[in-house]
């Protein structure tokens, strides 16, 4: 089987965990259960078939360096799980647009190199799948790269909360071009949103009325520092909120995107946490006899490795769709792997739909 030729835009902690993760599991036995992956062999593709052939960034400490070096450079501070040999993939100067917010601009030095022609670079590298890891709030930049993917006939995996796959206009653009997209906003393996979503549904399934809830997140990576700029947070808060409330069938919070009784979002930046994230979640409800029933928990994770396996699955799903000539949103992959897919499903149903897609039993 041929490799999946992958390009990355945004060589931050998530890209670091992705590149390290492919190296870490490249020799995994196909019958092994790997934490964070649906399958070692996802359809025709093994983890080792993911091959990085291009990368784009705007950080002067990354542009011009081999991807294997850039993933450990500048402000990247995630846990190291694997050495990565030289890849022969220099990080190219990407397009900035709105990709650098206030805190990014104060922290890193923007490369003075000329931005490359992204479409031509994707074509030259014969890229199959482009993964967008741009900072939260990069609305213009993310849509720019999405258009580049369409123009270069490259499948697009949208890991950030900019609504592209879930926007009917953009979905039609991808479908008309025959280019697959998996988006929007990557889920973690076991993160704050997925645990919150499951427990909110558990309340409902057990007949408890969920009246109010919050999810407060703190971390020490550049993602959290960037999100101190509250103007960049609107889509992030919406994505996390609707991921939780869309899993409720009825009750006062069902389907709510904005409500005083639901608060879900990043809260603060704590530098010494590095790439760790701490989530504080509380659910308040009413049980039999209108008696209060409250649940509170704290989740501690390394943020970036927590989604790396999910991205590997998303990349392989996008490539399968490309192989089959399917354009537009890949609904089964999106509903299981993303927080804000075009169509929300309960998680067990989403996984079953994706398994059926892998087997070729449903189109998308």
Could you say what each language-model-derived stretch is?
Residues 9, 133, 159-160, 184:
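Structural motif
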Residues 16, 163-167, 187-192, 219-221:
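Short gly/pro/ser/thr-enriched loop/turn and capping motifs at secondary-structure boundaries
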Residues 1-145, 233-238, 279, 288:
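N-terminal glycine-/serine-/threonine-rich beta1-alpha1-beta2 phosphate-ribose binding loop
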Residues 130, 156, 293:
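Receiver (REC) domain switch-region micro-motif
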Residues 9, 48-51, 62, 69, ...:
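Active-site-lining helix/loop region of Rossmann-like oxidoreductase modules
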Residues 135-151, 159-180:
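Rossmann-fold NAD(P)-binding glycine/threonine-rich loop
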Residues 173-186, 207, 211:
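Rossmann-fold dehydrogenase core element
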Residues 306-364:
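NAD(P)-dependent Rossmann-like dehydrogenase/reductase catalytic/cofactor-binding core
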């Amino acid at each position: 089987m041929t490799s999946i030729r992958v390009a990355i835009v945004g060589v931050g902690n998530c890209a670091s965990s992705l590149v390290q993760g492919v190296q870490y599991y490249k020799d995994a036995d196909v019958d092994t259960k790997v934490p964070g992956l649906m399958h070692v062999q996802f359809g025709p593709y093994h983890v080792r078939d993911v091959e990085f052939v291009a990368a784009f960034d705007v950080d002067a400490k990354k542009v011009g360096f081999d991807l294997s070096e850039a993933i450990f450079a500048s402000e990247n501070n995630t846990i190291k799980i694997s050495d990565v040999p030289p890849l022969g993939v220099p990080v190219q100067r990407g397009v900035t647009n709105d990709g650098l917010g206030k805190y990014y601009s104060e922290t890193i030095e923007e490369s003075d190199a000329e931005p490359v022609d992204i479409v031509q670079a994707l074509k030259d590298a014969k890229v199959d799948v482009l993964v967008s890891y741009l900072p939260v709030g990069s609305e213009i930049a993310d849509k720019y790269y999405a258009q580049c993917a369409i123009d270069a006939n490259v499948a697009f995996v949208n890991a950030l909360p900019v609504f592209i796959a879930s926007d009917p206009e953009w979905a039609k653009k991808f479908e008309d071009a025959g280019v697959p997209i998996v988006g929007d906003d990557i889920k973690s393996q076991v993160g704050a949103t997925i645990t919150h979503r499951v427990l909110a549904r558990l309340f409902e399934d057990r007949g408890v009325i969920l009246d109010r809830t919050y999810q407060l997140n703190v971390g020490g990576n550049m993602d959290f520092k960037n999100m101190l700029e509250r103007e960049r947070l609107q889509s992030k808060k919406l994505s996390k909120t609707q991921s939780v409330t869309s899993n409720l069938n009825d009750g006062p919070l069902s389907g709510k995107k904005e409500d005083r009784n639901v608060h879900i979002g990043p809260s603060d930046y704590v530098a010494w946490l590095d790439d760790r994230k701490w989530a504080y979640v509380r659910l308040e409800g009413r049980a039999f006899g209108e008696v209060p029933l409250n649940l509170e928990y704290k989740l501690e994770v390394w943020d970036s490795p927590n989604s790396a396996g999910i991205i590997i699955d998303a990349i392989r799903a996008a490539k399968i769709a490309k192989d089959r000539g399917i354009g537009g949103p890949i609904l089964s992959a999106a509903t299981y792997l993303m927080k804000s897919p075009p169509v929300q499903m309960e998680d067990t149903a989403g996984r079953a739909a994706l398994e059926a897609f892998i087997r070729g039993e449903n189109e998308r």
